[in-house]
Amino acid sequence: MEPAFGEVNQLGGVFVNGRPLPNAIRLRIVELAQLGIRPCDISRQLRVSHGCVSKILARYNETGSILPGAIGGSKPRVTTPTVVKHIRTYKQRDPGIFAWEIRDRLLADGVCDKYNVPSVSSISRILRNKIGNLAQQGHYDSYKQHQPAPQPALPYNHIYSYPSPITAAAAKVPTPPGVPAIPGSVAMPRTWPSSHSVTDILGIRSITDQVSDSSPYHSPKVEEWSSLGRNNFPAAAPHAVNGLEKGALEQEAKYGQAPNGLPAVSSFVSASSMAPYPTPAQVSPYMTYSAAPSGYVAGHGWQHAGGTPLSPHNCDIPASLAFKGMQAAREGSHSVTASAL
């Protein structure tokens, strides 16, 4: 006769899937095991699967109870405030301690037993979430206590002000002799724009204002740059040219140039003072053709009606230019007349 509910296992026993084994069968399994019967023989005798028998016996050996565990319930909380306090104490005593070492200490000190001791992953999570933030806060507080008070920042602008590392670097750079030293507060300050004008956005106005206020030298503003000229600069000393000694310049100009074969600049003659070369006889490029007149082409189709062969567009050719070496080339060449052609 088939049961009204449940399923039949391979041994012929009846079980309900998802439900624990009845307590009577559990007690019988434990009694047979105490009599020395092997789990496989208990499985065949009670028609219960071998895995179920082994699990029940293992739970009884660990907890001493034959009752099943909570189905669908949560595990009891093992990370109690007492456990967290002891974990924090272990971590403060030895910052390099591992999670598994903390677990062993909890068992050794009797804080937890083997049933409610937190796992290694739980201890790591406690160290990361609960104790890690407190440790970082403690380090930060101790750092603030040992940290000296910050120096007041120089106000570079009336709205925003913050320290600039460039001023400290500029203060370390030595100033060469003869050059006026620029105050450290003026050396490349970082400024926030106080308005939407171009000079304030670029920081030009603030730099020039600070230079004019702190430096004894006059620094013109952007509006005055267009009015500056060469007359505004002080004249150099008569014995110095651009800050250099005149005697040194004359000596360098006197002995610094090596003599070469080129004539001096003053020996060249301008082209206007030279007489133009005689104009050679113009030879027509169109030769006499002995064929019928119909085959003779008087000129090109693109030639201007009033133009000449040398100036087809009726343009005047300027006088010949004076070039060096043209006379020698002209004397060495023989003129060719039209009759020879």
UniProtKB/Swiss-Prot annotation:
Keyword Nucleus: yes
Lineage, top ranks: Eukaryota, Metazoa, Chordata, Craniata, Vertebrata
Function: Transcription factor required for normal development of thymus, parathyroid glands, ultimobranchial bodies, teeth, skeletal elements of skull and larynx as well as distal limbs.
PANTHER family, per database record: PAIRED BOX PROTEIN PAX-6-RELATED-RELATED, PAIRED BOX PROTEIN PAX-9
DNA-binding region: 4-130
Assembly description: Interacts with KDM5B.
UniProt KW Nucleus keyword: yes
GO MF term set: DNA-binding transcription factor activity, RNA polymerase II-specific; RNA polymerase II cis-regulatory region sequence-specific DNA binding
Origin: domain of life: Eukaryota
Sequence segments annotated as region (PAI subdomain): 7-63
GO cellular component: nucleus
Main location: nucleus
Region (RED subdomain): 82-130
UniProt entry keywords in alphabetical sequence: Developmental protein, DNA-binding, Nucleus, Paired box, Transcription, Transcription regulation
Chain intervals for the UniProt region annotation (Interaction with KDM5B): 168-189
Protein name: Paired box protein Pax-9
Entry's localization field: Nucleus
